[in-house]
Regions:
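Flexible N-lobe loop architecture of eukaryotic-like protein kinase catalytic domains
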Residues: 19, 59, 68-71, 84
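Conserved small/polar residues in nucleotide/adenosyl-binding loops
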Residues: 129-136
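Conserved N-lobe loop of protein kinases adjacent to the ATP-binding glycine-rich P-loop
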Residues: 30-37
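Protein kinase glycine-rich loop
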Residues: 15-21, 26
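AlphaC helix of the eukaryotic protein kinase fold
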Residues: 44-66
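Activation segment signature within eukaryotic-like protein kinase domains
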Residues: 115-116
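Activation-segment/catalytic-loop signature of the eukaryotic protein kinase fold
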Residues: 78
């Protein structure tokens, strides 16, 4: 786990943990070269020595980097800093849909439709970009 104040690639300063998934941890960081906050998705250390996981992580980064859509975060950089594998992305401040529902209760029809349209629009962009096969 990276610590606040740690610098990656002489550029990205780790500020805080944003969240974690099965194979990665997401940090809020400061890009000192471009003077902006970013999200950095870091492959967990237990997977860093596994060539298959590193390959999957790089493929994810490359696939994400090619997508441009208002409902999909932008990928800015892919980093390998002494065995620390990272995807540097646009930082989206706010709450998750789950948190929104927990705070506001059940979605009314108009809000549910609005969110669904935004999600579907982002998914459509992913599908068009990746050219899925019938098995997908």
């Amino acid at each position: 786990m990276l610590k606040p104040g740690m610098i990656l690639c002489d550029r990205y300063e780790i500020l805080d943990v944003v969240g974690a998934g099965g194979m990665s941890i997401v940090y809020k960081a400061r890009d000192h070269r471009l003077n902006r906050n970013v999200a950095i998705k870091v492959l967990k250390p237990e997977f860093s020595n596994d060539k298959n996981f590193v390959t999957k992580f790089r493929i994810e980064a490359q696939a994400s980097a090619g997508l441009t859509h208002p409902n999909i975060v932008n990928v800015y950089d892919v980093v390998d800093d002494e065995g620390i594998y990272c995807i540097v992305m646009e930082l989206v401040e706010g709450i998750t849909l789950k948190q929104y529902i927990e705070q506001n209760g059940r979605l009314n029809m108009e809000t549910a439709i609005n969110f669904s349209i935004q999600i579907a629009s982002g998914l459509e962009a992913c599908l068009l970009y990746t050219s899925p096969s019938p098995r997908d």
